Amino acid sequence: LPFWASCTSKYKIEGTSSVNSLDGKMLYLKSLRDGEWVKLDSAEVVHGLFSMKGKIDSVQMVTLYMDEESIMPIVLESGKITVTISNTDLKAVGTSLNNALYEFISKRNQLEESIGELEQKETRMVLDGGDLDEIHGQLVVEGDSLMKAMNQYVKTFISDNYENVLGP
């Protein structure tokens, strides 16, 4: 490479929001530095769309904010990052680390939802006339299995990403 080649990378964030209350608001990318949140970039949401672009020296974890309210984490890395904000979902995809982060969040949320549904399942089984001790025993086993699966998933994710910003 020629000696004048830059070490910086470019990022571009293309965002859509179906949350009406965000229209006309400013969104900020902030990074935590020495215990302080520092603004790196900003964009106004206009008709549900926003975009940011810039240069970075290294990959870093940042947070998308509206005013002082944290909305979602984003891995700021080279490439095009597509952000989707709705009342039911937050997602950043398009680059390898953002894809990995939001796949992890989605799977973890599914496991947490399954754990949360056990109480409803117990109620249905009791109302269907099942034996309370048998039901409790069965659901304890299911709950333990789901908790082990989630803990293993989190540990694997951390160890798989130990060498990048998604790790510990």
Outline where the language-model segments fall.
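A non-transmembrane, solvent-exposed segment enriched in polar/low-complexity residues
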Residues: 7-155
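Amphipathic alpha-helical repeat scaffolds of TPR domains
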Residues: 162-168
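Sec-dependent bacterial lipoprotein signal peptides
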Residues: 1-5
